[in-house]
């Protein structure tokens, strides 16, 4: 069976520093890049890559095995350090790209995101947008639970993340981040 390659970065490229917002070495050192397989919206199997904290690698492998088994479509999985994105969260969301580690702050705050520690993943941002009362990202994205690739409370993807101790941004009260799952920080990170 032919596999379509969405990302084939080497670890050095996937973990290169963002010159605009350098990551402390002790955080960068804990990140691992893993290959993941999934059906994309073309109905074919693709191979991508996700960078996450070493403590959550097994969780992400388990989730992507489930994604593949259930044919939950993923647009792409490409690290944000890839030249297509240059660490830009807006660009990766516009592309509908699934991503993990991104040393950055939470939108419109000065607090570090769980992505900054590699303990969060965004899945299909175009189907699962970030929505506040003032705006949504990516632009013109709609949350429609009937669309393929949309995460729903109680579905198998949600249930697996929840069983592994991850929190879903779709449950937040002040905003909805349907694409976002995060594993709470531990003292070790």
Regions picked out by a protein language model, each given a short descriptive name:
Residues 1-46:
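N-terminal module-boundary/linker segments of secreted carbohydrate-active enzymes
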Residues 17-25, 86-90, 108-112, 153-155:
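Intrinsically disordered, low-complexity boundary segments flanking structured domains
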Residues 24-28, 48-59, 111-115, 149-153:
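Extracytoplasmic/periplasmic, Sec-exported soluble proteins
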Residues 26-31, 94-96, 114-116, 174:
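A generic structural signal for short, non-catalytic loop/turn and secondary-structure boundary residues
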Residues 28-92:
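Active-site acidic/histidine clusters and adjacent loop/turn architecture
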Residues 33-36, 63, 67, 101, ...:
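Generic structural hydrophobic/aromatic packing signal, biased to beta-strands
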Residues 78-117, 128-130:
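Active-site-adjacent loop/helix surface patches within enzyme catalytic domains
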Residues 105-112, 117-189:
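Catalytic cores and adjacent binding grooves of peptidoglycan-active enzymes
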């Amino acid at each position: 069976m032919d596999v379509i390659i969405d990302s084939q970065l080497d670890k050095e490229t996937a973990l290169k520093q963002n010159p605009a917002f350098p990551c402390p070495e002790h955080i960068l050192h804990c990140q691992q890049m893993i290959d993941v397989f999934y059906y994309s919206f073309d109905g074919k199997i693709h191979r991508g890559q996700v960078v996450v904290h070493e403590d959550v690698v097994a969780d992400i492998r388990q989730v992507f095995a489930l994604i593949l088994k259930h044919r939950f479509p993923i647009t792409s999985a490409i690290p944000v350090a890839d030249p297509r994105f240059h660490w830009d969260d807006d660009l990766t969301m516009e592309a509908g790209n699934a991503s993990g580690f991104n040393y950055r702050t939470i939108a419109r705050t000065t607090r570090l995101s769980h992505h900054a520690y590699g303990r969060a993943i965004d899945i299909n941002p175009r189907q699962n947008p970030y929505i506040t009362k003032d705006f949504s990202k990516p632009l013109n994205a709609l949350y429609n639970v009937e669309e393929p690739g949309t995460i729903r409370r109680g579905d198998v993807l949600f249930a697996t993340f929840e069983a592994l101790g991850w929190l879903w941004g779709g449950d937040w009260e002040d905003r909805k981040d349907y694409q976002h799952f995060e594993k709470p920080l531990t003292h070790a990170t």
